[in-house]
């Protein structure tokens, strides 16, 4: 029986290799699928699905130690890019206009639920060996308007990204949290996600 199972597994792998079907890794504790082909080296925006007026933004002037929070602003402090590290893990780098770009990480390398996400390191070489600066994106499918939906997970802590407290126009901090409190994020190339009204404008 074990021999038959090994043969079947080998045949499946050969079929995938020959047909070019990408191998995606399922997360045991996630309803999403680990995305190993996130877009890199492009300006991206990370928006809260439950209220798309809110997107990731970096406090103040985006200097070392500035917190990442939710904001309705559409200015320069909400631009990010992804740098591929390995095996589905990415660095999330804040793009600072006329300043220093810095990677998001978990403050104090904490594994605790509720720990803040802030920006710190600017050197690309100092991300690969630092798991608190590495994040995975679990694809949940597109929304009705074609925006890609994700859960985001930190490598070191194994916790998910959400926000502290309530929205209520108070620009809450991005934090790592328990699975039950994780949020769905839209990752887009436009500051405002697709709304479905674009086709009406074209008409």
PLM features: what roles do these ranges have?
Residues 1-11:
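Bacterial N-terminal signal peptides that target proteins for export
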Residues 10-18:
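Gram-negative bacterial Sec-dependent N-terminal signal peptides
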Residues 17, 69, 93, 118-120, ...:
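Residues in well-ordered beta-strands of folded domains
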Residues 17-26:
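C-terminal segment of classical bacterial N-terminal signal peptides
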Residues 28-63, 79-111, 128-167, 186-203:
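Extracellular glycan-recognition/adhesion modules and their associated mucin-like linkers
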Residues 61-76, 109-125, 131, 164-181:
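Short, tandemly repeated low-complexity microdomains enriched for cysteine and small residues
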């Amino acid at each position: 029986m074990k021999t038959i199972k090994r043969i079947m597994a080998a045949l499946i792998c050969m079929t995938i290799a020959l047909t070019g079907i990408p191998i995606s890794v399922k997360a045991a504790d996630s309803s999403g699928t680990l995305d190993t082909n996130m877009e890199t080296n492009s300006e991206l925006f990370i928006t809260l699905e439950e209220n798309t007026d809110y997107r990731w933004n970096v406090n103040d002037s985006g200097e070392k130690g500035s917190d990442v929070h939710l904001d309705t602003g559409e200015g320069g402090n909400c631009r990010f890019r992804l740098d591929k590290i390995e095996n589905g893990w990415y660095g999330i780098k804040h793009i600072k206009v006329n300043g220093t770009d810095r990677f998001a990480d978990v403050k104090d390398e904490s594994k605790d639920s509720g720990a803040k996400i802030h920006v710190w390191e600017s050197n690309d070489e100092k991300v690969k060996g630092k798991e608190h600066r590495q994040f995975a994106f679990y694809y949940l499918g597109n929304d009705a308007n074609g925006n890609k939906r994700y859960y985001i997970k930190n490598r070191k802590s194994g916790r998910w990204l959400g926000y502290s407290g309530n929205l209520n126009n108070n620009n809450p901090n991005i934090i790592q949290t328990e699975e039950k409190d994780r949020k769905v994020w839209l990752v887009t190339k436009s500051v405002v996600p697709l709304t479905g009204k674009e086709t009406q404008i074209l008409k």
